């Protein structure tokens, strides 16, 4: 079975210090990076990958003021970037979704998880546990009483949607290998690799464990060599220019 449609859905932007994208650079310049959600239409039902930024980021570039990330991360979010608004735009309500896949629980990927009180949220155990105590996780991204489906390691969500365990950027990060009807195999690295440079040249970037992150990149490179998918990176400004976004699909 294959995924009928894979939509790239813009979910705002985030100003991030260039040293977070390339750790060899000195801090000081902010880059204007895209934030993405991905909608998969499958035979079993619609699946949403990541939920964007939290409500607290709407028109609030100072979200991280007084924290470890002050001046390093500036969210650029409007009401139109709220996950419920995004879903309405693409024709769904929260209760329509079969699953939420949380690649990881950072603020720009899991900020909207609270909109889904009943939908199963698929998350790696290592990520769920780390988010309980590590300072880089906002409370909106690890709300109690949601319907978490906790997994460990690689996992097939439905036929054609494979989760690949790629820790490093965060303790329990996961990427996706998706078989689509239109474009064949697609690899979403998500934040296992922000950019093509991180991936192809193994340029280090921000994260929990740089050695583990590099191991995950090497693992994904092996997947690419074997499976020959189209590869999309998590926050690549140059790649964004050529991305087909909703209502187009791949």
Curated annotation (Swiss-Prot):
SUPFAM superfamilies referenced in this protein's UniProt entry, alphabetically: Metallo-hydrolase/oxidoreductase
Enzyme class, broadest EC rank: hydrolase
Superkingdom, natural source: Bacteria
Record's cofactor remark: Binds 2 Zn(2+) ions per subunit.
Keyword Transcription regulation in annotation: no
Enzyme Commission number: 3.1.1.81
Cofactor entry: Zn(2+)
Catalytic activity: an N-acyl-L-homoserine lactone + H2O = an N-acyl-L-homoserine + H(+)
Residue positions binding Zn(2+) 2: 108-109, 191, 235
Record-listed Zn(2+) 1 binding positions: 104, 106, 169, 191
CDD domains recorded: AHL_lactonase_MBL-fold
InterPro entries given in the database record: AHLLactAiiA, MBL_superfamily_lactonases, Metallo-B-lactamas, RibonucZ/Hydroxyglut_hydro
Sorted UniProt keywords: Hydrolase, Metal-binding, Zinc
Gene3D superfamilies reported for this sequence: Ribonuclease Z/Hydroxyacylglutathione hydrolase-like
A single GO molecular function term of this UniProt record: metal ion binding
Record family assignment: Belongs to the metallo-beta-lactamase superfamily.
Quaternary assembly: Monomer.
Protein name from the UniProt record: N-acyl homoserine lactonase
Organism (species): Bacillus cereus
Upper classification of the organism: Bacteria, Bacillati, Bacillota, Bacilli, Bacillales
Gene (name only): Y2-aiiA
């Amino acid at each position: 079975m294959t995924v009928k449609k894979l939509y790239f859905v813009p979910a705002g932007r985030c100003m991030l210090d260039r040293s977070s994208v390339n750790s060899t650079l000195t801090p000081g310049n902010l880059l204007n990076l895209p934030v993405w959600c991905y909608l998969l239409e499958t035979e079993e039902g619609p699946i949403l990958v990541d939920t964007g930024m939290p409500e607290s980021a709407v028109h609030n570039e100072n979200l991280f003021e007084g924290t470890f990330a002050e001046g390093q991360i500036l969210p650029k979010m409007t009401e139109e970037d709220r996950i419920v608004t995004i879903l309405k735009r693409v024709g769904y309500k929260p209760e329509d979704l079969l699953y939420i896949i949380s690649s990881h629980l950072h603020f720009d990927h899991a900020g909207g998880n609270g909109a889904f009180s009943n939908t199963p949220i698929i998350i790696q155990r290592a990520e769920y546990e780390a988010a309980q105590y590590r300072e880089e996780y906002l409370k909106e991204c690890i709300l109690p009483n949601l319907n978490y489906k906790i997994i460990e390691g690689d996992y097939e969500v439905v036929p054609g949607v494979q989760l690949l365990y790629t820790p490093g950027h965060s303790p329990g990060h996961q990427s996706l290998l998706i078989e689509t009807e239109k474009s064949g195999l697609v690899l979403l690295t998500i934040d296992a690799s922000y950019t093509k440079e991180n991936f192809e040249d193994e340029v280090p970037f921000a994260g929990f464990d740089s050695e583990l992150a590099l191991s995950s990149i090497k693992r994904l490179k092996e997947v690419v060599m074997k499976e020959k998918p189209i590869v999309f990176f998590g926050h690549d400004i140059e790649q964004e220019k050529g991305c087909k976004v909703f209502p187009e699909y791949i």
